[in-house]
Amino acid sequence: MGDDFLAIFKTRAIIIKTQDIKESDKLVWLFTEKLGKISTIAKGSKKSRSPLFSTTLQFCYGDYVVYKGKSLYVINESSLIDSFQHLLNDLNDLTYASYFCELTDIAMDDGESSRELFRYLATSFYLIRSHAVDIETLARTFELKILKTTGYGLNFDYCALCRKKITSFEYLHLQYLGGICRECDKENSMHISYSTCSALKYLSSISMENVYKVVLTKEVKEELYKVLTLIISQNYFRKPKSLDILRNLISFEKNKV
């Protein structure tokens, strides 16, 4: 029997995904502050009288006590900080919150932890609820943060090919994830505007709490979406399905009279 078997852990966590199993149990994927992404089982949580009923819904943010079973962690206790269930009442909020959870699930392996990314996700939920931030700009910022956290951050300081120092660029190399100087070959690169280059650089460095201060033009937001969607699609093992929903939402907003 391993040393971790029946070891008890208490950690702050956000529920990024759930799946019903059996009559009263469900699988719950937690993105935790201490243990990273873990798969758990919440026994009896589908019963309305269960103390886990209201704390094991998707988007819930709280403190969870878990122990390691033979194959999964088991949720033993939970204390809710914020359920974020109000996000279910707005299609836009629901879609973006679901996307952030899905992207976190795709980008992080089981047991892989990042306190920084955990803070980004929690902050994003509060910002979505506040409606004080442009949600597209928030999404692009979160994407840049998660790319950097998982080793796919963009290089803004040196040419991706010759390593010459650069301050801005018009072409982004898709394989080496960096700008290309004027002299180097532009094959396997994407042209971007100066404004989009500046936005990428700024959003990569800004704190999540200050995203509400950023104002971007519609053209820049569209180009950011294309660039980051492509980078995410080519670097993670699968493309988030929510991206397609986001595209439909954006198109819907454009066609509003």
Swiss-Prot record:
InterPro entries in the record: ARFGAP/RecO (IPR037278), DNA_rep/recomb_RecO_N (IPR022572), NA-bd_OB-fold (IPR012340), RecO (IPR003717), RecO_C (IPR042242)
Alphabetically ordered keywords of this record: DNA damage, DNA recombination, DNA repair
SUPFAM superfamilies assigned to the protein according to its UniProt record, in alphabetical order: ArfGap/RecO-like zinc finger, Nucleic acid-binding proteins
Gene3D superfamilies in the cross-refs: Nucleic acid-binding proteins, Recombination protein O, C-terminal domain
Pfam families on file: RecO_C, RecO_N
Gene Ontology cellular-component annotations: bacterial nucleoid
HAMAP family the record matches: RecO (MF_00201)
Function recorded in the entry: Involved in DNA repair and RecF pathway recombination.
Record family assignment: Belongs to the RecO family.
PANTHER family for this protein: DNA REPAIR PROTEIN RECO (PTHR33991:SF1)
NCBIfam families: reco (TIGR00613)
The protein's name: DNA repair protein RecO
Species in which this protein is naturally found: Clostridium kluyveri (strain ATCC 8527 / DSM 555 / NBRC 12016 / NCIMB 10680 / K1)
Record lineage: Bacteria, Bacillati, Bacillota, Clostridia, Eubacteriales
